[in-house]
Amino acid sequence: MRKILRFGVIGLSMWGSLLASGLAQTATPVASVAAVDLTRYSGKWFEIASFPMFFQRQCVANTTAEYQANNSGGIRVVNRCATEKGVDEAVGVATVVPGFGNSRLKVSFFWPFSGDYWILGLDPEYRFAVVGSPNRKYLWILSRTPQLPAPLLDAALAAAQAQGFDLKELRYTSQKTN
């Protein structure tokens, strides 16, 4: 009986430790970078990798995003990708969430619905950006060029991992050049 009780206490203790460590990892909030210069951030970005998403299911290659300030104070967003049937394009508007140095945006492709667009990692030279959501369901690695050199890709992946993103779901995007 003592043996059973001792193993039961050890088992409960181990289970409690595992539960607490799992909660501690997932409870750490995602943080966006301190500041983003939206003028430098504007322009064309190539998707290097992303989590699979329903709204990108038809994309087979050449996924890009373009950002440009518009006259109403927002940011025009144009997402494009190659599909089996040609090119798919989605046009939306992003607005800055005040108080976060332009690193948190709300993006809407279909009013009144919007999603979180948080810049979680940003190369000092703006060569790559790590973008995700605070619930860790969305993640993109973006680059100014169709291919991201290995050291920069490693830095981008490290930034995502530091925010608690599980990179097992990450899918790399084919950027075919003609």
Question: Which sequence ranges carry the predicted segments?
Answer:
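A beta-rich soluble binding module of mature secreted/lumenal proteins
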Residues: 2-178
